[in-house]
């Protein structure tokens, strides 16, 4: 992969910096692992907006990704690497020895033809999935389960990884990308290495229309709204908010902690640093 700056043939192309990925498959995705996906535009079943700034965008198929890696002991070969419009990471299409094909999140450094395997006896190599009890302390891992057998929930975005700090009894301590240290059961599986497409965060989309293609709608500042729409709204002419920043519903923003899940507080060894948003 490499970053290139395109020629400024128009105002919309002038700021574009894109990731060149010649290793990705140029054809269609593997059809048996596709599902139809309808647009929700951030609405719930009542038609009310539950997530702002969503709507439109190009049609997409959902790729069924294997987050469980439960074909233990059966070797697989990476048939090809593919683009996935639903996530920042790329996908790797695996062909198992029994003929089954599955998508996984493509780890960094794994190329076409690589041999991967999952299970307790798998070698410590990028792309292999093992329980945390069998992974050496200090290893870099991704696609981590929070409950055994539930499937990976942590560290699935492009370029992310987690460090295995220690093991104490039935739990392992992990340092997440945010800086938080969390306890996870040692029977939970994780994949060795870090997620690929690490240059994803360095790209520049270049124009507003390209963001709309991704299903993202504009964000309107509260200070330019009316008082009925936002606490920062109103005033004669161009005025400041006159208060600490708040959300449209009056909750403090810009660093205000909103976590309310007390049930899993005992799984956190230390919170993320205050300056990490």
UniProtKB/Swiss-Prot annotation:
InterPro entries reported in the protein's UniProt record: NA-bd_OB-fold, Rib_uL2_dom2, Ribosomal_uL2, Ribosomal_uL2_bac/org-type, Ribosomal_uL2_C, Ribosomal_uL2_CS, Ribosomal_uL2_dom3, Ribosomal_uL2_RNA-bd_dom
Keyword rRNA-binding: yes
Cited SUPFAM superfamilies: Nucleic acid-binding proteins (SSF50249), Translation proteins SH3-like domain (SSF50104)
GO annotation (BP), single: cytoplasmic translation
Sequence ranges of Polar residues compositional bias: 43-53
UniProt keyword Nucleotide-binding, yes or no: no
SMART domains: Ribosomal_L2 (SM01383), Ribosomal_L2_C (SM01382)
Keywords: Ribonucleoprotein, Ribosomal protein, RNA-binding, rRNA-binding
Record's subunit section: Part of the 50S ribosomal subunit. Forms a bridge to the 30S subunit in the 70S ribosome.
Protein name: Large ribosomal subunit protein uL2
Gene: rplB
